[in-house]
């Protein structure tokens, strides 16, 4: 009887271990491809700036199966928005899930308004087969440049938002490792900005084109004033990108 119980326990532990090994997160190192390149085209309409188009690109280097670093850039025409960022990531496997800790430095240049926006963000990202959740904090600084000396006594040249909460939730209809997938997301950030209560929601997808290449995209809606203290505009945008590993 005891031998049978021991055998059952061993079988359960073995099956649990195997089950935990079958899941591989979308940001994990596969043991072969250390270099990752993402290129994205985007376009949309904003009630403040009108129509806009742009592009972004990100390079990621997996240093180990736990540590990675990345750098990216973005250009949005008509908005005259130019962005740069660097990020370091640590991955902590938790059974069948992954927990990522991200530290990020971001710089936005709003040339149309002569404003610089440096951002520091620290966040944790939990990823399962069907659900992903991000929580964190940002420090956002807005700085108006080129203000004439005679106006500086009564003109605000900048201000800081020291505690900008980062939150996001995504849900997939199929396992994340499936060759194709559809999902919904709800968050207060995008690739190159973080805002307090300016909510984004939309639809996302990905489709594997070949073992080293994946097509992905998002349709993103920002309703003006939706549980928001800051937003005064309404925006819709569409992204289409390629994810390539080598």
What is the predicted function of each stretch?
Residues 19-76:
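Short glycine/proline- and aromatic-enriched beta-strand/turn motifs that initiate or cap beta-hairpins
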Residues 195-246:
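Predominantly the C-terminal beta-signal and adjacent terminal strand-loop region
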Residues 35-36, 65-70, 93-101, 129-135, ...:
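Repeated loop/turn-to-beta-strand initiation elements of outer-membrane beta-barrel proteins
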Residues 11-20:
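Hydrophobic h-region of N-terminal signal peptides that target proteins for export
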Residues 117-191:
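Detector for outer-membrane/organellar transmembrane beta-barrel domains
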Residues 41-47, 53, 73-79, 92, ...:
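Transmembrane beta-strands of outer-membrane beta-barrel pores
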Residues 35, 49-55, 80-84, 114-120, ...:
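Residues that define the transmembrane beta-barrel architecture of outer-membrane proteins
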Residues 43, 55-61, 73, 86-90, ...:
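Residues on the lipid-exposed face of transmembrane beta-strands in outer-membrane beta-barrel proteins
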């Amino acid at each position: 009887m005891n031998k049978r119980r021991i055998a059952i326990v061993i079988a359960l532990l073995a099956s649990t271990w195997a089950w935990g090994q079958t899941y591989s997160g979308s940001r994990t190192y596969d043991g072969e491809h250390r270099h990752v390149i993402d290129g994205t085209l985007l376009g949309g309409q904003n009630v403040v700036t009108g129509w806009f188009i742009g592009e972004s690109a990100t390079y990621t280097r997996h240093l180990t199966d736990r540590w990675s670093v990345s750098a990216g850039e973005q250009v949005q025409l008509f908005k005259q928005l130019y962005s740069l960022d660097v990020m370091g990531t640590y991955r902590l496997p938790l059974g069948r899930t992954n927990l990522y800790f991200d530290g990020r430095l971001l710089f936005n240049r709003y040339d149309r308004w002569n404003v610089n926006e440096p951002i520091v963000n620290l966040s944790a990202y939990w990823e399962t087969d069907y659900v992903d959740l991000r929580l964190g904090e940002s420090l956002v600084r807005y700085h108006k440049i080129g203000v004439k000396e005679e106006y500086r006594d009564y003109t605000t040249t900048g201000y800081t938002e020291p505690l900008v909460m980062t939150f996001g939730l995504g849900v997939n209809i199929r396992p994340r490792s499936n060759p194709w997938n559809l999902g919904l997301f709800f968050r207060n950030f995008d690739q190159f900005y973080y805002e307090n209560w300016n909510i984004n929601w939309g639809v996302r997808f990905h489709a594997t084109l070949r073992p080293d290449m994946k097509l992905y995209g998002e349709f993103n809606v920002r309703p003006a004033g939706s549980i928001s203290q800051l937003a005064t505009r309404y925006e819709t945008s569409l992204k289409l990108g390629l994810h390539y590993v080598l």
